[in-house]
Curated annotation (Swiss-Prot):
Parts forming coiled coils: 4-41
Residue stretches spanning the membrane: none
Ranges of biased composition (kind: Basic and acidic residues): 181-190, 457-468
UniProt subcellular location: Cytoplasm; Nucleus
Protein origin, superkingdom: Eukaryota
Biological function: Promotes unequal transmission of alleles from the parental zygote to progeny spores by acting as poison/antidote system, leading to poisoning of progeny that do not inherit the allele. May possess DNA nuclease activity that leads to spore killing, and a kinase activity that confers resistance to the nuclease activity. Can suppress meiotic drive by the P.comata SPOK1 protein.
Stated name of the protein: Meiotic driver SPOK4
Swiss-Prot/TrEMBL keywords: Coiled coil, Cytoplasm, Nucleus, Toxin
Keyword tRNA processing: no
Annotated spans, Disordered: 180-230, 414-499
GO BP terms: meiotic drive
Keyword field contains Ribonucleoprotein: no
GO molecular function per UniProt: DNA nuclease activity; kinase activity; toxin activity
Originating organism: Podospora anserina
Length: 758
């Protein structure tokens, strides 16, 4: 081989070696990049990274079905409250959202607190595998793509001590699976939720100067939103922060959302078109008008929920958009709306999304939640007072606001398609500015009642036939109860508020002594109020006690009566109330239920009668049943009409209580021996009573009564002697459910062993 060939060969080998080296380096770089990518995808993410991932992998994963295959039909809103005006929620857009977004960004910083990108990618794949064509599909999408991330971010804020206190960031959850507590168990779930003509007629016939005597004062339709934002109170208990509803994406057409929500008189136009039953001949105009009708009805439904559940905040979730809503309690007739359309506002993905991440659905809903936490939900007397104002101020679909024409709106028969389209590419601007409040958005106290209506010539609408005397004054009193006293010194208004129960619960021994006619219990925290003229006896007997409670609640269902917790302290058919009997200071609880569930409370009363000698020890002291003629209002416009009076049983046993199950079995054995099968193994029905040092059992509405075991044994001894019975022959006369308990008791207690002749 010549030198030239040798050199050529060496050069070729050198080049091959360099190529292999470069290839190895490239492979190493690729492996390193892949490793870094995997590490990046599997490590937790920062706040901004998480927002980007949620939008890219979850929100953009939504796939909609062809509208021809989607659910059809209008939202049922007949008889529901709707606002007169729709205005942009500029305070949220310009003040609240920027403030809260900056707050969350500051608290989270660059800490890696949230789900890895791989998790959101995998979930996004699952979302994209299912087409969404109805509310149920949107429900699943909203939970995965929006609600779960929002809840995770709020959880981080709740653990931040400074932010938790300063901005009232509590523990929070979306409750989208509400039990239908307002319907009887056997009631058809497909019942129409519209108000009947009879209900509307009764509502219209209600006298303006009469005190409310029944729930017929209001619209009596079943109101059950798709979901409620539930926040945990610092001192325990839960309350609603906002209401939300899911809508199929095609029912809130995103191409018409901005133009429709920019129309101040959207509701009037839609109601007028429906009442006149007039359709445009232009197909394009028809599509727009139908889209506006769908949007107006979706907004009306949530607005009605906001009013009747006593909250100022709500939203409509329709997949491609969120409609964030707010109503000021100083102006019930105006609904403020912020349309959130992330696909348009965020745009196509780029390398740097930082300046647009605040427009994502998750970011905007976080700010919405934080805004709602600054407002207290109305309940009890304040809710009823507010609804009195709403009833006098608002119209129900499809009644018309008589004075809308005087605001400069053309009658529907004179309006043209062109005039209706003027707002399609513009945003509404009104001379009447939004309130501009930054956080609380509450009414200002003054020496005069706040005006229900905005300034102008709108007062002609509400004459004597539609208003109630003192409604505004009552509302001021309600506001003061919820928000605390002001510096205005409205002593007269504050005096209008019914006193709430404030004392500790009476002891079991105290209320048992009252029922049995025995001496006072000196250990009762309220014994000084029970004692009259230095006597050691109770000032009233059990019958007089029940009658006095009834008379006190007849004057007002809110006098000395307060619902403990609508969302937490509730059973299968009732809610828990704390009561105080004035002036004797007896403090106890009531189990309240709806008018059509009286039979279940009566059954529970019969169970307590069977367990009479166990009252105050194994079960609470039963003090009778009363009717509230006026009814105690609940969120959603239902009324507690009947209430069973009892002693307070105690608290749920702590998880660290080692012998809780043993004590529970002892109490179950005790009631079983009296012929009662509890029939409800819910943990909330077994409470630790420190006074008696045992587990007390409550809620007997599902209990089954059977002859006590002792009575059976005596009955068998009195019969002629026949062939010797075995335990199995004895059990053939008992139901299968009873048999299981008998077997257990035969193993534990001689009292449960059946007697045999011979």
């Amino acid at each position: 081989m010549s030198d030239k060939d040798r050199i050529t060969q060496l050069l070729r080998k050198l080049e091959e070696a360099k190529a292999r080296e470069e290839e190895a380096k490239a492979r190493e770089a690729q492996e390193r990049c892949e490793k870094e990518r995997l590490q990046l995808e599997h490590r937790k993410t920062t706040f901004l990274e998480y927002l980007r991932n949620c939008h890219r992998h979850l929100y953009n994963a939504l796939r909609l079905t062809d509208t021809s295959r989607s659910s059809t039909g209008y939202t049922k809103v007949v008889g529901k409250y709707y606002p007169k005006r729709l205005r942009p929620w500029t305070n949220f857009t310009n003040v609240l959202h920027p403030r809260y977004f900056d707050l969350v960004q500051k608290i989270c910083g660059q800490r890696q607190l949230f789900e890895p990108a791989s998790t959101t990618k995998n979930l996004g794949t699952i979302i994209s595998d299912h087409l969404a064509g109805n509310e149920k599909a949107i429900d699943r999408f909203e939970v995965d793509a929006v609600e779960r991330p929002v809840q995770g971010i709020l959880k981080v804020l709740a653990t931040h001590e400074e932010a938790g206190k300063a901005y009232r960031c509590p523990e929070f959850r979306f409750s989208a699976n509400l039990r239908e507590l307002t319907q009887e168990d056997d009631r058809s779930s497909g019942a129409d939720d519209n108000t009947s003509d009879g209900s509307l007629e009764r509502r219209q016939q209600a006298g303006p100067n009469k005190r409310p005597t029944s729930k017929r004062k209001y619209i009596c339709s079943n109101r059950q939103p798709d979901g409620v934002g539930i926040r945990m109170q610092p001192g325990g208990g839960q309350t609603q922060a906002f209401i939300y509803d899911y809508k199929a994406a095609h029912k809130v057409a995103i191409e018409h959302v901005r133009s429709a929500t920019a129309k101040e008189h959207l509701f009037h136009e839609v109601v007028a078109r429906i009442n006149d039953d007039k359709l445009s001949r232009d197909e394009e105009v028809q599509r727009r008008e139908q889209a506006e009708a769908f949007i107006a009805m979706a907004l009306t439904q949530v607005f009605d929920y906001m009013i009747t559940y006593g909250v100022s905040y709500g939203y409509v979730a329709a997949g491609r958009c969120l409609l964030l809503l707010y109503v000021d309690r100083d102006d019930w007739q105006t609904l403020y709306c912020h349309p959130c359309l992330p696909a348009d506002d965020v745009g196509e993905p780029t390398n740097d999304w930082t300046d647009r991440l605040s427009h994502t659905a998750v970011a905007q809903l976080v700010s919405f939640c934080l805004s709602s936490f600054q407002s207290e939900a109305l309940e009890g007397q304040s809710l009823e007072t507010a609804l009195s104002v709403a009833k006098a101020t608002l119209k129900t679909w499809s009644e018309s606001y008589a004075d809308v024409a005087y605001l400069g709106l053309e009658p529907p028969e004179l309006s043209s398609a062109a005039s209706s389209q003027n707002t399609e590419n513009s945003e509404y601007t009104s001379e009447a500015k939004p309130t501009g409040r930054k956080v609380a958005l509450r009414s200002q106290s003054s020496c005069k009642p706040a005006a229900v209506l905005p300034q102008g010539n709108e007062h002609d609408e509400h004459d004597e036939d539609h208003s109630e005397p003192g409604a505004s004054r009552s509302r001021l009193a309600a506001n003061k109860r919820k928000r605390g006293p002001s510096s205005g010194g409205e002593d007269e208004d504050i005096a209008m508020a019914d006193p709430e129960p404030t004392r500790q619960y009476c002891t079991q021994a105290c209320l048992l002594g009252l029922k049995r006619g025995k001496d006072l219990d000196e250990n009762c925290p309220n014994v000084s109020l029970h004692r009259f003229d230095g006597s050691s006896r109770h000032p009233v007997n059990a019958h007089r006690f029940t009658d006095m409670v009834k008379q006190q609640l007849l004057l007002s269902p809110y006098k000395g009566c307060r619902m403990v917790d609508f969302w937490d302290k509730r059973g299968a058919m009732g809610w828990l109330f704390k009561l105080e009997l004035f002036p004797y200071g007896y403090t106890f609880v009531g189990k309240g239920t709806l008018e059509d569930r009286l039979s279940r409370l009566e059954h529970e009363g019969r169970v307590y009668a069977r367990l009479d000698h166990l009252q105050g020890d194994v079960v609470p002291v039963h003090l009778g049943l009363v009717r509230l003629d006026r009814g105690y209002i609940l969120p959603g416009l239902e009324f507690v009409v009947y209430m069973m009076l009892m002693s307070w049983a105690g608290q749920t046993p702590s998880a660290s209580m080692a012998d809780a199950e043993t004590l529970k079995r002892e109490s179950l054995t005790a009631i079983w021996s009296e012929g009662v099968d509890h029939g409800d193994d819910n943990r909330a029905n077994y409470l630790w009573n420190a006074e008696r040092c045992r587990i007390m059992i409550i809620d007997f509405d599902r209990a089954h009564l059977f002859p006590p075991l002792k009575a059976r044994a005596v009955s068998r001894l009195s019969k002629p002697k026949r062939k010797r019975e075995t335990p199995n022959s004895y059990l053939t006369e008992i139901t299968g459910r009873e048999a299981r308990y008998v077997f257990k008791q035969m193993d534990r207690s001689p009292r449960a062993t059946p007697s045999h002749g011979g």
